């Protein structure tokens, strides 16, 4: 049965009416004054993550209408279809099974009766590959002659492992340094190579097809540098994370780890693409990372919608985007190790849900993915928080805080936590008794995600939470969250422009591109 498009459901009309009568004038300060139990009602526990949703512009009635919208658009059926291995990526005719990468060999409770029988063989392949990858990771960790690991990839082959290695810095094996090269801009690779010695470096080439232009350009340059510096054993100092084993072998690489076409790039950190993380934190740590994500999978798959954290977050995103008209969300992790977390979420959400047509290719009359942006706190307070507090646009903020520090420097962590609590409070309560430039309107919404500690398990759960939250909003909007056709046109045109930069031929180009090309060649 084809789900009903969200704007054609009774729940959508009810939500429009609710926004006009209550939502647009909703006052957080008044809501707390009238309801002593608001914090408890709008707080939600989930594996490794506690969420305070109480500072959002929503009441119980509106949330019930949002839950009804989810039901009327077939969210539960769509979720179950994903976990059943159905080809819900309809434009590419692929299943969406990144969750299988973190499913234990025997888990009889994954959703409607676990891993379906037809996926048992695939799950076995997943764990065979995982064991081989972790064995390699442990060998690299034990090899004291390898001090530098360079991951060459782009998009999901870069952002995921880079974000995770940085986030789990407290767990990284001493004596190993990790570098990530993604940009085709040679300055990035050159800056890394200047710090390396070929005999102590391992290069990981991460490309599913082993044809990605940026990645292979960097890989060839890294290989040329290695050989020019006297390196001779390509097979020992290069490994490939790819499905194109033949191309890797032709490159001179004999050690390869593959994955499957149902693993999208932005969901690939759980696969062989996570090898840098496995080397950094070890096999035990990587298994904990997978286990944390799997715990969130179970939560999403089995907990009723009203107590399901990814569902509540995803529906809140729909409420803000389509009824309040908010076009962006600020991500503010109050932990310096999460410095690449906002960038990771940018790709996850904006590449997944930044679509203008539905899953059937029909143009949509309503907004989809918001713009995500942010920086770690407290740095962001001295950059863009001015606009969050006193700007003309309301931007929902999503804070992430960690209860326990991974250092023993006295006073620092308490001050950090005081700041994140104060910012969330200030956004809500404002300062009405001051005039003019010192007036803070308040009533600015925020969500607060709290981890007990930043560990492999809690990071895995946090990432999986965000994956499923994006699934929820994309499902309600009726879009395919698992393709990314929007990245293709620029790549095609870049090949043509590269030839023109060499030849100078501007025939058929628009005036602006022709003028810029001529100036670059002058």
From Swiss-Prot:
GO terms for molecular function: carbohydrate derivative binding; glucose-6-phosphate isomerase activity; monosaccharide binding. Pfam families: PGI. The gene is pgi. It is found in: Cytoplasm. Belongs to the GPI family. It catalyses: alpha-D-glucose 6-phosphate = beta-D-fructose 6-phosphate. GO terms for cellular component: cytosol. InterPro entries: G6P_Isomerase, G6P_Isomerase_C, Phosphoglucose_isomerase_CS, SIS_dom_sf, SIS_PGI_1, SIS_PGI_2. Catalyzes the reversible isomerization of glucose-6-phosphate to fructose-6-phosphate. PANTHER family: GLUCOSE-6-PHOSPHATE ISOMERASE. It comes from Albidiferax ferrireducens (strain ATCC BAA-621 / DSM 15236 / T118). Keywords: Cytoplasm, Gluconeogenesis, Glycolysis, Isomerase. This is Glucose-6-phosphate isomerase.
């Amino acid at each position: 049965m084809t789900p009903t498009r969200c704007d054609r459901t009774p729940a959508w009309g009810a939500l429009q009416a609710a926004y006009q009568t209550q939502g647009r004038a909703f006052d957080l300060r008044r809501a707390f004054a009238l309801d002593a139990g608001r914090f408890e009602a709008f707080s939600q526990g989930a594996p490794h993550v506690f969420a305070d949703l109480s500072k959002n512009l929503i009441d119980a009635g509106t949330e019930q209408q949002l839950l009804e919208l989810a039901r009327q658009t077939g969210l539960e059926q769509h979720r179950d279809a994903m976990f059943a291995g159905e080809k819900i990526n309809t434009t590419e005719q692929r299943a969406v099974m990144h969750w299988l990468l973190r499913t234990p060999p025997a888990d009889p409770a994954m959703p409607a009766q676990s891993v379906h029988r037809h996926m048992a063989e695939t799950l076995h392949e997943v764990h065979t590959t995982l064991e081989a990858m972790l064995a390699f990771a442990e060998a690299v960790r034990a090899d004291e002659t390898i001090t530098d690991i360079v991951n060459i990839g782009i998009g999901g082959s870069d952002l995921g492992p880079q974000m995770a290695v940085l986030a789990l810095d407290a767990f990284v094996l001493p004596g190993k340094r990790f570098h990530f090269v993604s940009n085709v801009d040679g300055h990035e690779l050159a800056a890394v190579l200047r710090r390396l010695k070929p005999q102590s470096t391992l290069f990981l080439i991460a490309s599913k097809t082993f044809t990605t232009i940026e990645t292979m350009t960097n890989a060839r340059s890294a290989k040329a540098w290695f050989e020019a510096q006297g390196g001779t054993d390509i097979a020992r100092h290069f490994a490939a994370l790819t499905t194109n084993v033949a191309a890797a072998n032709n490159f001179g690489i004999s050690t390869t780890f593959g994955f499957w076409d149902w693993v999208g790039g932005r969901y690939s950190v759980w696969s062989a693409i996570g090898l840098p993380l496995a080397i950094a934190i070890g096999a035990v740590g990587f298994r904990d990372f997978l286990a944390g994500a799997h715990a969130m999978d179970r939560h999403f798959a089995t907990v009723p919608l009203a107590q399901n954290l990814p569902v509540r977050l995803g529906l809140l995103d729909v409420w803000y985007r389509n009824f309040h008209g908010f076009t962006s969300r600020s991500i503010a992790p109050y932990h310096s190790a999460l410095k690449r977390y906002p960038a990771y979420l940018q790709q996850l959400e904006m590449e997944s849900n930044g679509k203008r047509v539905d899953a059937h290719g029909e143009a949509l009359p309503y907004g989809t993915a918001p713009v995500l942006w942010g920086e770690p706190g407290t740095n962001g307070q001295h950059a863009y928080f001015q606009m969050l507090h006193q700007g003309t646009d309301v931007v929902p903020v999503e804070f992430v805080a960690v209860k326990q520090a991974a250092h023993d420097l006295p006073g620092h962590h308490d001050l950090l936590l005081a700041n994140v609590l104060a910012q969330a409070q200030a956004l809500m309560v404002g300062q009405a008794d001051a005039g003019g430039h010192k007036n803070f309107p308040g009533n600015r919404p925020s969500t607060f995600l709290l981890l007990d500690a930043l560990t492999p398990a809690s990071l895995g759960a946090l990432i999986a939470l965000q994956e499923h939250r994006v699934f929820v909003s994309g499902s309600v909007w009726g879009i395919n969250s698992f393709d990314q056709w929007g990245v293709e046109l620029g790549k095609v045109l870049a090949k043509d422009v590269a030839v023109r930069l060499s030849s100078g031929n501007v025939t058929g180009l628009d005036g602006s591109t022709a003028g810029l090309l001529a100036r670059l060649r002058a």
